[in-house]
Amino acid sequence: PPPPPQGTRHLMSHEPAEHGKVLQRMPIELRWRDLDAFNHVNNSNFMTYLEEARIRWFESLGEEWVTDATAPLLAAVQMNYRQPIPYPGSIVVELTADRVGTSSVTLGHRITSADGTVLHADGHVVMVWIDRGSGRPTPLPAAVRRVAGG
């Protein structure tokens, strides 16, 4: 077969991504509505699972992570789909702190089977905190920085 297009080697890699400090492990029970015509979880639901894990992690901080003046935005998403998620079943979403910057945090993610033996997806998201008035980046909330290790 021809070689992959230049610059796509990492994206097409079958090797799981390296991740940092574990922030959250959230079990999720699959729902019938998550399925597609192929009788496995639709790929768009993977993003919903990640969103739910991020929000639960933010809420677990015990301090403000969003205010009237500042809020996080999803700036980038990278998802490697490794194996379909069959129904019925359960999964675990794991979030990790991969990088902590001045106004952003890169959160690694893994979606595995409940017993951790099957990796369904991995990758990362970049969250940037902005000033709601100006739309410009603003420093990370202290709780996010402290817990994520920055």
Where is each model-derived feature located?
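Short linear sequence elements within intrinsically disordered, low-complexity coil regions
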Residues: 43, 51-54, 86, 92, ...
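Hot-dog-fold acyl-thioester-processing enzymes
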Residues: 13-76, 131-150
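Short, Lys/Arg-enriched N-terminal segments with co-localized hydrophobic residues
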Residues: 1-11
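Hydrophobic beta-strand-centered segment that forms part of the acyl-chain substrate-binding groove
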Residues: 57-105, 120-121
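HotDog/MaoC-like acyl-thioester-processing domains
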Residues: 12-26, 81-87, 98-150
